[in-house]
Amino acid sequence: MREKDYVVIIGSANIDVAGYSHESLNYADSNPGKIKFTPGGVGRNIAQNLALLGNKAWLLSAVGSDFYGQSLLTQTNQSGVYVDKCLIVPGENTSSYLSLLDNTGEMLVAINDMNISNAITAEYLAQHREFIQRAKVIVADCNISEEALAWILDNAANVPVFVDPVSAWKCVKVRDRLNQIHTLKPNRLEAETLSGIALSGRDDVAKVAAWFHQHGLNRLVLSMGGDGVYYSYISGENGWSAPIKTNVINVTGAGDAMMAGLASCWVDGMPFAESVRFAQGCSSMALSCEYTNNPDLSIANVISLVENAECLN
């Protein structure tokens, strides 16, 4: 079945520029460290991780007609992702994402230049309507415009749509369309922003999940940091999945790997609780790698990690 099935990912593609400090950062000063340029973008990262997990992943995104754009498409295609339907915008710069990480791997601040994502319009998507509607699952990220997200949700037909909120700032684009979303993967802040309910701890998650389901969301996968992941189905299934002990090197891309894991498990028909645990394994592998996308990601490696992992609670 998987040979015929494919996943369509609609979202951002950009060049990641990451600065790693060797020591604790001294602000307003030059810090010794390492600077790396790697392919990135939420949608593109999800697509690459899906390809690593053995899926046919088709990326619909936009890049500029510059060196970085061509390099991005070439590297993404070499990673196993189909990029034939990506849009090349003449005269525009390819998106870039600049992040600064401390010596523990924690991201301190980031700046993004993603104006080209506005080129992912309803008109562009409509050119690929039939292809999108034949996908096994659609994954969209909130870097694209509200108009584009609305088109996806209105035209998905019977294809489930998984949405990555990206940030508290951008997730509001889908607040009024939760009933059209199959699976949403917010973190604590994004869930608070959408629901208007404070998440002070584990005791509040059921209330937040109930709010999402009352507004029509089918499945909620809520990342609660050190408390683990809370998952909830509109049918009533819910539970906690404990955090996996991980040697954190780079937090960039961990959420993208998790979304890829969830989508991959949907393609394979895996039960919800097992899907969440597998997705956590994908995230753990991303966290433990210096690159945004761990090249060692595979179904076998994730299963091995999950089966042998030490839980934190």
Give residue ranges: language-model regions:
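Glycine-rich phosphate/adenosyl-contacting loop at the front of the ribokinase-like
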Residues: 1-74, 78-81, 247-248, 313
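Short beta-strand scaffold segments in enzyme catalytic cores
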Residues: 96-100, 109, 228-232
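A glycine-rich helix N-cap at a beta->alpha junction
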Residues: 78-91
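Short, conserved phosphate/pyrophosphate- and ester-handling motifs at nucleotide-, phospho-/glycolipid
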Residues: 50, 187, 255
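Conserved beta-alpha-beta core of the PfkB/ribokinase-like small-molecule kinase fold
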Residues: 137-207, 227-228
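Conserved phosphate-binding/catalytic loop of the ribokinase/pfkB sugar-kinase fold
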Residues: 88-89, 99-137
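Conserved phosphate-binding/catalytic region of the ribokinase-like
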Residues: 2-9, 31, 170-171, 175, ...
